[in-house]
Amino acid sequence: MKLAVFTDSSAYLSAEILQREDLFVLDIPVNIDGEEYVEGINLSAEEFYQKMAQASELPKTSQPSIAKLDEILTSLKEQGYTHALGLFLSSGISGFYQNIQYMVDDYEGLTIAFPDTLITSAPLGIMVESVFNWRDQGDDFASIQDKLAIQISRTSAFIMVDDLDHLVKGGRLSNGAAILGNLLSIKPILYFNDQGVIEVYEKVRTEKKATKRLIEIIKETTASGQYRVIVIHGNAPEKAEELRQHLLDFGLGSDVSLATFGSVIGTHLGAGSIALGYIPVI
């Protein structure tokens, strides 16, 4: 089996993984005040948050290019590939997953699967990494898909946003609820539900209590089994490092890493947002 792995630029990937010849990353363009950017090409994460703060309206992200995906899939057979696996951002935040399902049976001599990851950002990047590890240890395509299904079902992220007004602009919270929330110092904890949709998990008074609750949730959720935990932030590195230290102090093991939200999730949640993602080691 020669396996090609696809993902999109919403995945948080290490420089080492990005250099692999059998990895194909589809760009997700972001439009900020009429200018189009692609993160990692002509836009860094830091620049994105700077531009978003100065923009007259929220940035808009597009779906990855189906034409580009088709072009690469068409070329795979002559490169000796026999299988292709696409791990893209959750169907709960993008229509791309639904829009490409017709392609699975369109390429003769190529076995293709596009599972719904129900997640994005750093956990999505770790899924990609896991697939390469399983392939390298000799797993066949069916076994990789089975392990991936287990991993997807036990992966999520819990999120605390810094600015409720940003959720209003994105249509995730009413203006009245945001005004009341700001007055009462309410910090809603959001999460990726089992449909891969970002929704409110619970509401907590004050950031300090919300941070403590985030840690409790992750500790409860990852109590059985081995997990990788990632602190993901929207241009808030100091807050993220502080939370990482809290997690280590609470005994969540040594495998707690840091990552940044890119433009896709950053647009939804705003600067200062912070999340705890978790994914099982299989």
From Swiss-Prot:
Keywords: Lipid-binding. InterPro entries: DegV, DegV_C, DegV_domain_contain. Hexadecanoate binds at T61, S94. GO terms for molecular function: lipid binding. Signal peptide: none annotated. It comes from the Bacteria. Disulfide bonds: none annotated. SUPFAM superfamilies: DAK1/DegV-like. Residues 3-280 form the DegV domain. It holds the Pfam family DegV. PANTHER family: DEGV DOMAIN-CONTAINING PROTEIN DR_1986-RELATED, FATTY ACID-BINDING PROTEIN TM_1468. May bind long-chain fatty acids, such as palmitate, and may play a role in lipid transport or fatty acid metabolism. This is DegV domain-containing protein SP_1557. It comes from Streptococcus pneumoniae serotype 4 (strain ATCC BAA-334 / TIGR4).
